[in-house]
Amino acid sequence: MTHRTRFAPSPTGHLHIGGARTALFSWLYARKHGGTFILRIEDTDLERSTVESVNAILEGMTWLGLEYDEGPFYQTHRFDRYREVMEQLLEEGHAYRCYCTKEELDELRAGQMERKEKPRYDGRCRHRSEPRPGVLPVIRFRNPTEGEVAWDDLVRGRIAFQNSELDDLIIARSDGTPTYNFTVVVDDLDMKISHVIRGDDHVNNTPRQINILKALGVEPPRYGHVPMILGADGARLSKRHGAVSVMQYRDEGYLPEALLNYLVRLGWSHGDQEIFSVDEMIEYFDANAINHSAATFNPDKLLWLNHHYLMHSDPAHVAHHLRWHLGRLDIDPTEGPDPVDVVVAQRERCKTLVEMAQASRFFYRDFDDYDPKSAQKYLTAASVPALESLRRHLAVVRSWEKEFLHAVLVATGEEMGLKLGAVAQPLRVAVAGTAVSPPMDVTLHLLGQLRTLNRIDRALQYIEAKKD
């Protein structure tokens, strides 16, 4: 069997966490079975669909590494095809024109609500043959009235609906534009989609889509409906729970593989394993192992995963992403140490790339001010002898390598009768502007001799100026 899956977002906003997880599951399913992953843009909502949203979706997919094999296909390019299938359904008696006015439908609904019945269209135009003057009709699918429609869901097992529960769905509006449930069916048919993995908010759409496909004489794809994602308070995940856009996580300093790893574990598991490479995700992924209940989004767990990936990923890979974050701070990475070396120095104490970029600014650019508390504690008259001694030794050190720099620090402490920390902390504040940095020999090595000496000179001037 050829496996063909699709991700079909509507371009009315950014790629959000729920959509990204759906895309990931569909992508993994295709990759696991050697199949094809298709990207389809469902842009028939002309009022809300924007080019900016399309670009945001494509950018998010690229950043996550979810490459698609076919597409992107746009529904707005396929209106002629939708009209063709619509006419086929009309000619074969599977669809009909409905001339009911809004007032009639409102009256019908009000009566049903009053009788505590489920609001639904009663099919009154099923047998109407004559058009009504001045009324532009919609087109409705003639849903079967007997029997049931059922499918073996990839996630939830057997699901069945009685056809008597389903009314005659509108498949074309009065202006002729097709509706969601109809375009999806035609697209899945034409693109030979074999498996559909999507959110469980689509469960009620599935029986309608299956019936339309059967009316067209084709076998429906296999469906799998994934439970929604909740916030910690049990409500559906939204902006009030924090970031929901994939690219917002990039902007906040997360690695794409950390977010992928978190998303794949959000409702799916493989034993007790927490960390998955992409290859392992593909190897182990099984739609049957997706949980039936909603998953709860835990930002602390995502942050933990991100730190894990910062610690254990190839430093060159992390540095590639760090350069982007340095650029956001208007820092040119060529005007200082190699970002690969910065990653190695900083990753143990930084949980995000934003933290790492901000903590590494002093390597590339002189700072305007010292951290007030650090300067008050360490840049004092008592620190001057140690800073002056360090300045002399560092100016003539044989090699600007870490072991020689460490030796200078130790020798200065012994010479001054001070512990290493009493020597290193004033120096750290002098060169980094704060009392927090990588180990002192590493910091000096990355900073370079000229910058180090200039900053010691500046610190000594700062201390002198405080006397006045």
From Swiss-Prot:
Residues noted as binding ATP in the record, renumbered to the chain: 239
InterPro entries: aa-tRNA-synth_I_cd-bd (IPR045462), aa-tRNA-synth_I_codon-bd_sub2 (IPR020751), aa-tRNA-synth_I_CS (IPR001412), aa_tRNA-synth_I_cd-bd_sf (IPR008925), Glu-tRNA-ligase_bac/mito (IPR004527), Glu/Gln-tRNA-synth (IPR000924), Glu/Gln-tRNA-synth_Ib_cat-dom (IPR020058), GluQ/Sye (IPR049940)
Catalytic activity: tRNA(Glu) + L-glutamate + ATP = L-glutamyl-tRNA(Glu) + AMP + diphosphate
GO biological process: glutamyl-tRNA aminoacylation
Cofactor(s) the protein needs: Zn(2+)
UniProt subcellular location: Cytoplasm
A molecular-function term among this protein's GO annotations: tRNA binding
Keyword Secreted applies: no
Cofactor: how bound: Binds 1 zinc ion per subunit.
Top-rank taxon, per record: Bacteria
'KMSKS' region (motif): residue ranges: 236-240
Sequence positions that bind Zn(2+): 98, 100, 125, 127
Primary site of residence: cytoplasm
Pfam families for the chain: Anticodon_2, tRNA-synt_1c
Enzyme's top EC category: ligase
Motif position, 'HIGH' region: 9-19
Enzyme Commission no: 6.1.1.17
Keywords: Aminoacyl-tRNA synthetase, ATP-binding, Cytoplasm, Ligase, Metal-binding, Nucleotide-binding, Protein biosynthesis, Zinc
Protein purpose: Catalyzes the attachment of glutamate to tRNA(Glu) in a two-step reaction: glutamate is first activated by ATP to form Glu-AMP and then transferred to the acceptor end of tRNA(Glu).
Family to which this protein belongs: Belongs to the class-I aminoacyl-tRNA synthetase family. Glutamate--tRNA ligase type 1 subfamily.
HAMAP family from the UniProt entry: Glu_tRNA_synth_type1
Subunit structure: Monomer.
NCBIfam families: gltX_bact
Record protein name field: Glutamate--tRNA ligase 2
Source organism (scientific name): Methylococcus capsulatus (strain ATCC 33009 / NCIMB 11132 / Bath)
Gene name for this UniProt entry: gltX2
